[in-house]
Amino acid sequence: MARIAGINIPDHKHTVIALTSIYGIGIKRSQYICNATGIPQNTKLSTLSETQIDTLRDVITQFTIEGDLRREVTLNIKRLIDLGTYRGLRHRRSLPVRGQRTKTNARTRKGPRKPIKK
């Protein structure tokens, strides 16, 4: 297993798919990384040389990934809450933020139903 950005990348998968196991790298970004390094996308990670893996690491370090990205997202949500915006209010109340209906749906966000006491 190759270790990139503190994550063990699966060797048996193609490079494009294997890179998506890093938080913050999806299919499009992994395709960009493969094109930037000159590594074919359908090459298995186990067949890459150490120098190719080093070039992958160099390109990946240019992006905000893993813990830094998670921290950035949490700080953005915290900033919305502190500013008192409508989106921050929805985050604070654990309700859908992007305008979805809540009368019948949104069970994932709201949690299990609470029984009405009589």
UniProtKB/Swiss-Prot annotation:
A Pfam family per the record: Ribosomal_S13
GO biological process, one term: translation
Keywords: Ribonucleoprotein, Ribosomal protein, RNA-binding, rRNA-binding, tRNA-binding
Region (Disordered): 92-118
GO molecular function terms listed in the Swiss-Prot or TrEMBL record: rRNA binding; structural constituent of ribosome; tRNA binding
One GO term describing the cellular component: small ribosomal subunit
Keyword rRNA-binding annotated: yes
Keyword tRNA-binding: yes
UniProt similarity note: Belongs to the universal ribosomal protein uS13 family.
Protein role: Located at the top of the head of the 30S subunit, it contacts several helices of the 16S rRNA. In the 70S ribosome it contacts the 23S rRNA (bridge B1a) and protein L5 of the 50S subunit (bridge B1b), connecting the 2 subunits; these bridges are implicated in subunit movement. Contacts the tRNAs in the A and P-sites.
Subunit structure: Part of the 30S ribosomal subunit. Forms a loose heterodimer with protein S19. Forms two bridges to the 50S subunit in the 70S ribosome.
Protein's recorded name: Small ribosomal subunit protein uS13
Name of the gene encoding the protein in the UniProt record: rpsM
